[in-house]
Each structure stands twice: as structure tokens, then as C-alpha cells.
Amino acid sequence: MSILFSPAQIGTLQLRNRIIMTPMHLGYTPNGEVTDQLIEFYRVRARGGAGLIVVGGCGIDRIGNAYGMTQLDDDRFIPGLRRLADAVQAEGAKIVAQLYQAGRYAHSALTGQPAVAPSPIPSKLTGETPVELTEEKIAEIVASFAKAAKRAKTAGFDGVEIIASAGYLISQFLSPLTNKRTDRYGGDLQARMTFGLEVVAAVREAVGSDYPIIVRVAGNDFMPGSHTNTEAQVFCQAMEKSGVNAINVTGGWHETQVPQITMNVPPGAYAYLAYGIKQAVSIPVIACNRINTPDLAEAILQEGKADFIGMARSLMADPELPNKAMSGHPEQIRPCIGCNQGCLDHVFRMKPVSCLVNAEAGREAELSLTPTSQPGKILVIGAGAAGLEFARVAALRGHKVTIWEESDQAGGQLILAAAPPGRKDFLHLRTYLVNACRDLGVEIQYHTKATPENILSAVQEGKFNRVVIATGAHPITPPIPIEEGVKVIQAWDVLAGRSKAGQNIIIVGGGAVGVETALLLAESGTLDNETLRFLMLQQAETEKELYRLLIQGTKKITVLEMANGIGRDIGPSTRWSMLADLKRHQVNCLDETTVLEIRREGVLVKNAGTQKILPADTVILAVGSRSQNELYQALQGKVEYLSIIGDAIKPRKVMDAIHQAYNEAIKY
């Protein structure tokens, strides 16, 4: 880690290392005022070793605002911001405020007034048509950027970042998709850059010549007809000439159809965008998006693709990532898995952000893992996500913990979740939990089937004085008539590799498990990455043919869902891309379809009042799960300290299981 942990500068700002916590919308400031929740969240990340923390977005006015956003539009916010700056700086990190104006991405229901934009082009995010900005109003917004920057400086912040990416207001002026103006702010690229340049000039005048200014740009908008990396380089060169001290390079707009930070994006996939900018400018460049490990961060720096590394969700997952890596213990880092369940999905639902893998995220002000005053001997039944997390936290608090696991491996449904394409990061979480338990002295006994008798015997012998049931759930077989001789298997068995499907497959159930199973099977017979790379390098096939070979597998797949819509239980930040993949792989999806019978010749279904047979050689069931709580019921009243966690209570998402297990463990 010779480069990652070396000191570096952005303008006059000296940083202790090259790890930058890039801005995240957290929703921790419901009234715009800095809260203790926000302060403790960032204090912990600063203490964990980050070199720079970028807070944001911070609203420069109310018309371009978002819910729960920290505000910089009035002097009354300065005292709270000063408390935040003091807290971060006291831990050795520096702090920067990101100046935010959403433009057409703002929602009138939140701001109380129509959104504004360079041109009245409807927003795909809000469904609203913004009001076209007058030149007078443009001047007001430019002034608001400057005033907000001045307030950040007055509050003791070490610099400011101007957001010119993600499809927000400056992006909207830059793009020909959203800027149809005929005045000096519209037309060719030079004219469309005018607004952004005016913002930078006004901010520079407000804060002085030696105050650091960063601009966050889209290395590629990933919007057909908008900016590519070529235009981004021209804009960044103009930013450098205007006095900007660093460029923070991210990916596309929020409405792009190219995934940006979901789990299926390969780690470091967009570092090439930062490298393109770095070749065009001489000021420092920050690489972002799915850079989740210190080793990857160091490799990007060693290859000369960037000068700094942006990590946001990685530091939400583990605030101590820098310190653990610097001390030579990267294996102890709790991994961000790119699931988006607690972060981006919560933003879309206008909820405060949390984290699937880190139940403490956003709760730093209220939680403190203190040693227990009464160390116990705890038996946990089941080494799934909930059982492992409970064991980890209980052991941290000083309990002696043993896990009985019936199978030959830990992880439970994390292993199933990792099976579909682009989902392997769930295995990183499994590895972390198993290793953390091992390091804390938790004993996992495999091939150990728990019964009421052997549990009670172990308790009576004094081996354990507390029992936690984490037996999870099992898949449901619905009460559908099934003709003898038909191949009917469970989706869980397909995901686990225990059952093989034929060539003409019907999946009953179009929720998350059904969709994931379909995507796994749809890749059967498609080009693998190594072959694709070889054929591309040799120019052996046309791009069109390579694309066909990449998406066209050897199986015919149909997904049936009784309700309206496919994948309705998948988070909004991920669902759209998974549905797009189903379409790409030509998976046939039928919703509002009831399965009546499963016969040798196929599946009898009813759709829109009409019955028909859908031919199939394999039927896969993905219709939900049921809690396995028989042990808990059998032990009630017989074990003094008995509790139940995770899916054993009620089937739930992994995040809910982990958080509930954590909450239970801190009670012990």
C-alpha cells in the first residue's frame, strides 16, 4: 500500500492518505440542520483513517433540494456545520462540502415549487416538466453556489466540491439532451459549459485563490446523445483553466440504463474514465465507483489511472477500512457487497440510509458495543447470515459462542444469493463473517444436527446457558396438482447446484428468487469472459455476433408470476437492471398468471381468463419460504434463556436478518 497511504495534496490541502470518502445522500438531516447522527457517522469514518471526507450533497438553495439534505443556503446552518467540521478534523481527516443543485431532478412535492432546468425537458426520475430558467434566475443560482461555498469556509470546512455529474443542474446545462437553449448558455459545447464555468468563477471569488475547489464530473453520461468521455475531457480541461484544484470522476446519470454501482458492476470498472481525464489534465484526479478493497485501490494508483481513490459505501460498510489495511489486516475488513439495499434503495424510498452488512451505520450516536457484565456460554443453532452475525457480536462482547451447523459449510442463503451472475459479492460477506467468528474464538461445529434432546442435554450438562435459534427457512411447495413423473425441483436446489434443469424450463414464481434463478440458467451456453476477450482481440466475429453469443443461451426459460409485475420484492436500484437482463436473455415473463396444474406435457396456466398449456421439461418452484422454528417451539419453557432470530422468526431480506441478529446480540 505504498501509494494509497502516502500523503498527498489537493491545492493547498494536505491529506494524510489518498482515501477520500466521496459524498453520499444519507437523509440524516431532516430539517437541513446538522444532527448528532450526522456528526457521529462522519466522526467514526474520520477516526477509521480516511484522508478526506466529502459531505453532501449540501443544498445551495431550496428549489433544487432533496429530502433530508444538509443545507448551506442560510447562515443559521453555520454553527452546526462548524461542529461537524471540528469533529472530523479532530480525528485527523479533512472535510469538504459538496455544493448541490438538482435542477430537473428536484421534486415539487418536496420543495413546494416547480423544479428548474436549462430547458423544459421532462424528468424521467420525477415525471415532472421543469420550468426553463431565465438568465436572471441563472444569475441567482450562480450567486447561491458562491454564498454556500463562503458559508462552508466560514464553518471551517477545508474545501468545497461542486457537483457537475449524475444528471444534476450543471450536467443538464452541459448535455444537449437537456439543454436546448439558444442564448449564451446553449448551443455548442463551449456555450453549454458557460453555466458551470460561471459557477466555478463565482465560487473562486467567494472563497479566495488558495481555497481548494473540487469538481465532480461524469466521465461518461452513459446517455445516448449526451456526453461521452471525449466531451468530459474538454470540460475538465476548462475546469482546470478556471482554477479548480481536483477532478472527482464518477460515472453516468441517475437515469442511465448502464448500471453504475450495483453488484453486477465489476470492481473498478469505471477507473478507465478517471484515467481518460487524468491524461487530459495536470491537476489531481479521483477515481470512483465500486472500488471496494485496498488492494484494488492500490492497483489503480500504481497503474497511474488516478491520484486519489473515492470510497463511499465501502466506508459505510466498514469505517475502519483504512486503519485495518494500513495495519496489515485487510482480511478483517467488512466488505461492501454493492447490494444497495440499505443505501441507494433507502434514498429512492426517502428513508435514512443504512447498510446491509453494518447494522451500526447511521446509529453511531446511539450504539456502543460494551463488554458484557455477565459472560455466558451461548449455543447458536444455524450458521446462516443471522447466526453468524449474532455469534460475531456476542463474541465481541465477551460471550463464549458455539454454533451448530447441520451442513458442511456456513453461510446459509448467502451461498444461494451469490449463485446468479453478478452476485458473487455475497460470498465476500460470508467469508468475512466466518473469519470474524473464527478470530473471536467462535467454534463452528459442522455436520451437527440439532434436536430438542441434544440441546437440552448440552444445557443440563452446563456446556451452555443460553440458546439462540437461527435455523432459517425452507422453500415452500405450493398445493398445486403435480402429475407423477414430472421433473419438479426447488429454485434453492438449482442455485445451490444440487439440481440440474433441462432445456425447456418454467419457473413458478417471479419474485427475487425466481428472477435470480432465471438469470443463472439464462447464462447457460453463452460466451464466457475469456472466450469473449479472445474473440474480440482476434476480431474473429463482428460486434453484433459477439453480442448475440453473449446473451443467447441454450435454454428456453419462462417465468410465471401470479401477481402484477415481475421482481416486485427486488430493490428499486437493482430491479430495473435485472429485468433488463431478463429481456436481454430473451426470458419470457408472464405476470398475472395462475398455475393450475403441472402435467407431463407442461404447465396448465390461466391468464386473462384463458387456460393454456405451456410445454416444459423442468418446472422450478420459487414461491417463497417458510420459517423453520420447530426447535424453538419445542424448547420454549425448557431453556431459561432462549431466543430466535432471522428467518426462523419470519422470512425476510438478508439486511433485516443481520440487523435483527445484531440487535438481539447487544441485549445479551
Curated annotation (Swiss-Prot):
Assembly and binders: Homotetramer.
Record bears the keyword Glycoprotein: no
Chain sites annotated for binding FMN: P23, M24, H25, G57, Q98, R216, R290, A312, R313
Gene Ontology terms for molecular function: 4 iron, 4 sulfur cluster binding; FMN binding; metal ion binding; oxidoreductase activity
Keyword annotations from UniProtKB, A to Z: 4Fe-4S, Cytoplasm, FAD, Flavoprotein, FMN, Iron, Iron-sulfur, Metal-binding, NAD, Oxidoreductase
Necessary cofactors: FMN; FAD; [4Fe-4S] cluster
Cellular component terms per the entry's GO annotation: cytoplasm
Subcellular location: Cytoplasm
Family: In the N-terminal section; belongs to the NADH:flavin oxidoreductase/NADH oxidase family.
Its job: Metal reductase able to reduce Fe(III)-chelates to Fe(II)-chelates, as well as soluble Cr(VI) and U(VI), using NADH as electron donor. Cannot use NADPH as an electron donor. Is unable to reduce riboflavin and FMN with NADH as electron donor. May have an in vivo role in metal reduction in D.reducens, which is an organism capable of reducing contaminant heavy metals and radionuclides.
Highest taxon in the source lineage: Bacteria
Chief location bin: cytoplasm
Upper taxonomic lineage: Bacteria, Bacillati, Bacillota, Clostridia, Eubacteriales
Name this polypeptide is given: Metal reductase
GO biological process assignments: catabolic process
Binding-site residues for FAD, renumbered to this chain: Q341, A386, E405, Q413, R423, A450
SUPFAM superfamilies assigned to the protein according to its UniProt record, in alphabetical order: FAD/NAD(P)-binding domain, FMN-linked oxidoreductases
UniProt-annotated binding residues for [4Fe-4S] cluster: C336, C339, C343, C355
Domain notes: Has an FMN-binding N-terminal domain (NTD), an FAD-binding C-terminal domain (CTD), and a 4Fe-4S cluster between the two domains. CTD is the main contributor to the iron-reduction activity, and NTD and the 4Fe-4S cluster are not directly involved in such activity.
InterPro entries: Aldolase_TIM, FAD/NAD-bd_sf, FAD/NAD-binding_dom, NADH:flavin_oxidoreductase, OxRdtase_FMN_N
EC number: 1.16.1.-
Keyword Membrane (UniProt): no
